[in-house]
A protein has these predicted regions:
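Glycine-rich phosphate/pyrophosphate-binding loop and the adjoining helix
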Residues: 135-136, 141-181, 185-187, 191-193, ...
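Buried hydrophobic positions in well-ordered alpha/beta secondary-structure cores of metabolic enzymes
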Residues: 9-12, 65, 131, 174, ...
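Short acidic loop-to-helix transition motifs that present clustered carboxylates
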Residues: 111, 220-227
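N-terminal beta-loop-helix "entrance" segment that forms/cooperates
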Residues: 31-55, 227-229
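Generic secondary-structure signature for well-ordered alpha-helical cores
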Residues: 24, 28-32, 63-66, 95-102, ...
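Glycine-rich phosphate/diphosphate-binding loop of Rossmann-like nucleotide-binding domains
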Residues: 4-21, 25-27, 150-223, 235
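Glycine-rich phosphate/nucleotide-binding loop
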Residues: 43-46, 107, 229-329
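N-terminal glycine-rich phosphate/adenylate-binding segment common to multiple enzyme folds
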Residues: 47-157, 244-246
Length: 357
């Protein structure tokens, strides 16, 4: 199996290296082979090639069975032209691979409930999956930069556009995921204001009635969903949402977990999938060996499950992370008195060794 490695910027190299050690351990234990191809993306690609997404990176990603991404961006590239910012590399590879579905699981365990800004009894046991449409909507609609209109008034615009096929394919992902979980989908929109949301709600309801009657469907306005995530996160199973709402809600949900250093994500389409932690490149701690690699390791577990057809290995990797947490090992972002402080590479090694037991 071929994996395209895109460490990217900041802490990306450290966390990807730790995750690769764990993946190698899984391959050894479960009897499969991994071939790696490391490429550039983001700021490091700008420095080396002048663009955030070189053609060689696209070719490698398309030829791979899966892509593992670290993180992109940093203040070093804040003032480059908008069309070559590091984040353009991320958007570009999503488009090149046809990745239209972003999966973000969020769980709060007994080991992390005390980290949540919510009361532990409110947060512990939360287990939800955000299914976000990734390549449509306002981020990919027609844009006009600030300019003077015919009346001499400065204006700018961004178009929110969805088609029926785009809504149907992401909704199907959500319904299928719910069938394997607790059988409940919460579809999020702003149908009281937006025409695109009214179409979204209509299509999702039609699909539930026709193809998924066994799945419970609820519709929430996005503002109510944002509030309910804080008031009662345990009520949610699968949250289905468009691109911009999903971007915001998934970041909100991540704060409930108490640490973005624990949260993985998958971006899927009809071909090669891409896996990455939800946190950023954290350039302020890059190279210090203190970054938390667990979100990247858990992203690899998602890779094993969704792209490499290695469900047993995925379950074992997640269990190894839980075991290491239960043994009291923590990177500095999660460290507290009475626990065992370890570095990025040490955490990766601990999980790998636990997996090999």
């Amino acid at each position: 199996m071929k994996i395209c490695l895109l460490p990217g910027d900041g802490i990306g190299l450290e966390i990807v290296d730790a995750a690769v050690e764990v993946l190698d351990a899984a391959a050894k234990k479960f009897g499969f082979e991994i071939e790696y191809d490391k490429q550039l993306i983001g700021g490091c690609a700008i420095d080396a090639t002048g663009v955030p997404l070189p053609e060689a990176t696209i070719a490698s990603a398309k030829a791979a069975d899966a892509v593992l991404l670290g993180a992109v961006g940093g203040p070093k590239w804040d003032n480059v032209a908008p069309d070559i910012r590091p984040e353009k590399g991320l958007l570009g590879i999503r488009k090149a691979l046809g990745l239209y579905c972003n999966l973000r699981p969020m769980t709060v365990s007994k080991f992390t409930a005390h980290l949540s800004p919510l009361k532990a009894e409110r947060a512990e046991g939360a287990d939800l999956l955000i299914v976000r449409e990734l390549t449509g909507g306002i981020y990919f609609g027609e844009h006009t930069e600030a300019h003077l209109n015919a009346d001499g008034i400065e204006e700018a615009s961004d178009i929110e556009l969805y088609t029926r096929p785009e809504v149907e394919r992401i909704a199907r992902f959500a319904f299928e995921a719910a069938k394997k979980r607790r059988g409940k989908v919460t579809s999020v929109d702003k149908a009281n204001v937006l025409g695109s949301s009214r179409m979204w709600r209509k299509i999702v309801a039609e699909m539930q009635a026709k193809d998924y009657p066994e799945v419970e469907l609820n519709n929430f306005y996005v503002d109510n969903c944002a509030m309910q995530l804080v008031l009662n996160p345990k009520q949610f199973d699968v949250i289905l949402t468009n691109n911009i709402f999903g971007d915001i809600l998934s970041d909100e949900a991540s704060t409930i977990a108490g640490s973005i250093g624990l949260l993985p994500s998958a971006s899927l389409g009809d071909g090669t999938g891409m896996y990455e932690p939800i946190h950023g490149s954290a350039p302020d701690i890059a190279g210090q060996g203190i970054a938390n690699p667990l979100a990247t390791i858990l992203s690899v577990a998602m890779m094993l499950r969704y792209s490499l057809n290695q469900n047993e290995a995925a379950d074992a990797m997640e269990a190894a992370v839980d075991a290491v947490m239960e043994q009291g090992y923590r990177t500095p972002d999660l460290y507290a008195e009475g626990l065992k402080n370890v570095s990025t590479s040490e955490m990766g090694h601990l999980v790998a060794q636990e997996l090999l037991k």
